[in-house]
Amino acid sequence: MKNNNSLKNQNINEYLEISKRRSLRIERIRDYFKEQNVLEVDTPVTSKSAVSDINIESVQVTINDGPFYLQTSPEFSMKTLLSMGYGDIYQICKVFRDYEKGSIHSPEFTMIEWYRLHFDLTGIIKDTCNIIACIIDDDSLIQNIT
């Protein structure tokens, strides 16, 4: 039987390995977009308005005695940037959705969202496959999606 310190060390080592793999995948995504000349943006995490999608519940917080909502997606802010004349953009960010808790769900998770001007459906599909391919370590899986 293992003692508590041994279990803690095992958990720390597992989490450290997961963190390293996650960091590498995010780095690969950033490298891909940099090669494609896509600008990384950073939009606000809070808003005075909740999301209008009836299937998504926003998380409300209080800031300076007023209600704010944590973003469920950076979509609205990113589309605002597009309307201001930004070109191709992407963002890797934390988003929040109430009632998304379960064995494989968390109310807080990381999302990647990107917009490409002048891409048709085929271009978007290829872009998505390229992003997936850059984070997959098994080459046999890459051949199946491209």
Where are these regions (language model features)?
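Short, acidic/charged, Gly/Pro-enriched secondary-structure junctions
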Residues: 31, 133-134
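Class II aminoacyl-tRNA synthetase-like tRNA-binding/catalytic domains
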Residues: 1-123
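Metal-assisted phosphate- and nucleotidyl-transfer catalytic regions
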Residues: 134-146
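Short amphipathic C-terminal alpha-helix that caps PH/PH-like domains
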Residues: 125-132
